[in-house]
């Protein structure tokens, strides 16, 4: 069955603001929230579950600027396996409903709380609430030359890692006991009366962080958190062709989890230093090259810069200021692995200054030797100007 358009699912158009999308999501999610179907038939529960999943899938994409741009460009194909988006399709894990509904809209502190994987319409009451550690972001500054050719960099960053003394358990001698707060369930349930009726929600136990276990005796080194601050050194391979603002993901190099889950990820954000000569647009490089008046008139050869040194190019006779010349294949290597961009040279004619009397005299004689045929644009402009004045007088 084909997926519905995400904008249609939330009932908004493509130009809807972030706030409008959030309001539409809240309204739709409240309508199909599982607690409202507690006494419904199995068929109604199943239908509501599918709609609720669809609503949250749509919101997870449209509320994220990067994913929204991918969806607008590629549609659902952006998020299919191997597509241009986030690869594995929609996953509710780690999605913070509390950001939309607030901590108390459906009861106790976590919004939809334990509605993990959208299995809240039934099933086992004992689930795994192990959460991954936090992701980290690192800004890596490189030169344009390094971006063009690729480079290996070594970075150092601080993160919250596992405590070496308790191996991340938080317990002295690794001895654990059943969490008394949640009785080993990993979650706590809360009920609250709202205008929609009594709402029940589940949230991760704040004491055991969803594991159902707590230390018999807390580790004296980490005080029971199972984590410790550490400095990590990592070699980063920056591929040739990468652009400013693009990210490199290193799975598992983020912060440690407090609930025994996997580490978060490390995202390297590339920042390219401004260049003295070139401006980059995609895989092409743009630069301005000044030429003399005589070279512009008579033509000739000039040296233009590239990332691999200088290259001699021909300047056509009669070149005007602002004329563009393409130097093929001297731009940035495509990140996709094939082809290179170009260098686009913009010629600017430099007007000579501080002329001697003799030079001025020669230039004046040269100017007097010219006629309308030598100035096509000027002649054309004067004809049009003359016609305008004639029409006004008539």
Curated annotation (Swiss-Prot):
Molecular function per GO: ATP binding; heat shock protein binding; unfolded protein binding; zinc ion binding
UniProt: Zn(2+) 2 binding residues: 179, 182, 205, 208
Domain of life, per lineage: Bacteria
Signal peptide (UniProt feature, chain positions): none
Listed transmembrane segments: none
Segments annotated as CXXCXGXG motif repeats: 163-170, 179-186, 205-212, 219-226
Keywords (A to Z) from UniProt: Chaperone, Cytoplasm, DNA replication, Metal-binding, Repeat, Stress response, Zinc, Zinc-finger
One Gene Ontology cellular component annotation held by this UniProt entry: cytoplasm
Cofactor: Zn(2+)
Zinc finger region(s), CR-type: 150-231
Protein's GO biological process: chaperone cofactor-dependent protein refolding; DNA replication; protein refolding; response to heat
Pfam name, any one: DnaJ
Domain J: 5-75
Subcellular compartments: Cytoplasm
Cofactor, free-text remark: Binds 2 Zn(2+) ions per monomer.
Positions that bind Zn(2+) 1: 163, 166, 219, 222
Family affiliation: Belongs to the DnaJ family.
Free-text comment about domains: The J domain is necessary and sufficient to stimulate DnaK ATPase activity. Zinc center 1 plays an important role in the autonomous, DnaK-independent chaperone activity of DnaJ. Zinc center 2 is essential for interaction with DnaK and for DnaJ activity.
Listed NCBIfam families: DnaJ_bact, PRK10767.1
PANTHER family linked to this entry: CHAPERONE PROTEIN DNAJ, DNAJ HOMOLOG 1, MITOCHONDRIAL-RELATED
Role summary: Participates actively in the response to hyperosmotic and heat shock by preventing the aggregation of stress-denatured proteins and by disaggregating proteins, also in an autonomous, DnaK-independent fashion. Unfolded proteins bind initially to DnaJ; upon interaction with the DnaJ-bound protein, DnaK hydrolyzes its bound ATP, resulting in the formation of a stable complex. GrpE releases ADP from DnaK; ATP binding to DnaK triggers the release of the substrate protein, thus completing the reaction cycle.
Assembly notes: Homodimer.
Name of the protein in its database record: Chaperone protein DnaJ
Organism: Fusobacterium nucleatum subsp. polymorphum (Fusobacterium polymorphum)
Lineage: Bacteria, Fusobacteriati, Fusobacteriota, Fusobacteriia, Fusobacteriales
Gene: dnaJ
């Amino acid at each position: 069955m084909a997926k519905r358009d995400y904008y249609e699912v939330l009932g908004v158009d493509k130009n809807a603001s972030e706030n409008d999308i959030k309001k539409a999501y809240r309204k739709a999610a409240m309508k199909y929230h599982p607690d409202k179907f507690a006494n419904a038939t199995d068929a109604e529960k199943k239908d509501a579950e599918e709609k609720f999943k669809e609503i949250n899938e749509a919101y997870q994409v449209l509320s994220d600027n990067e994913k929204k741009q991918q969806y607008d460009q590629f549609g659902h194909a952006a998020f299919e396996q191997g597509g241009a988006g986030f690869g594995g399709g929609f996953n509710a894990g780690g999605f913070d409903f509390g950001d939309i509904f607030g901590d108390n809209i459906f009861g106790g502190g976590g919004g939809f709380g334990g509605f993990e994987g959208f299995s809240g319409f039934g099933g086992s009451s004992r689930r795994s609430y192990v959460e991954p550690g936090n992701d980290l972001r690192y800004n890596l500054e490189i030169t344009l030359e390094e971006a063009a050719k690729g480079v290996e960099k070594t970075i150092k960053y601080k993160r919250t890692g596992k405590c070496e003394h308790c191996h991340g358990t938080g317990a002295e001698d690794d001895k654990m006991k059943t969490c008394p707060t949640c009785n080993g369930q990993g979650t706590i349930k809360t009920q609250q009366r709202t205008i929609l009726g009594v709402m029940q929600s589940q949230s991760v136990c704040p004491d055991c962080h969803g594991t159902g276990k707590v230390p018999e005796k807390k580790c004296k080194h980490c005080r029971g958190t199972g984590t410790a601050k550490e400095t990590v050194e990592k070699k980063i391979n920056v591929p040739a062709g990468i652009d400013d603002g693009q990210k490199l993901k290193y799975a598992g190099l983020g912060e440690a989890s407090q609930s025994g889950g996997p580490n978060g990820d490390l995202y390297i954000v590339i920042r390219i230093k401004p260049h003295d000569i070139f401006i980059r647009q995609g895989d092409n490089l743009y630069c301005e090259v000044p030429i003399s008046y005589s070279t512009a008139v008579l033509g000739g050869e000039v040296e233009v810069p590239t990332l691999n040194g200088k290259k001699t190019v021909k300047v056509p006779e009669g070149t005007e200021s602002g004329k563009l010349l393409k130097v093929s294949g001297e731009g940035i290597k495509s990140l996709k692995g094939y082809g290179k961009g170009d260098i686009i040279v913009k010629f600017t004619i430099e007007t000579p200054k501080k002329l001697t009397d003799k030079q001025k005299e020669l230039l004046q004689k040269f100017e007097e030797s010219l006629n309308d045929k030598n100035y096509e644009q000027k002649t054309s402009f004067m004809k049009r100007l003359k016609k305008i004045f004639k029409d006004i007088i008539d």
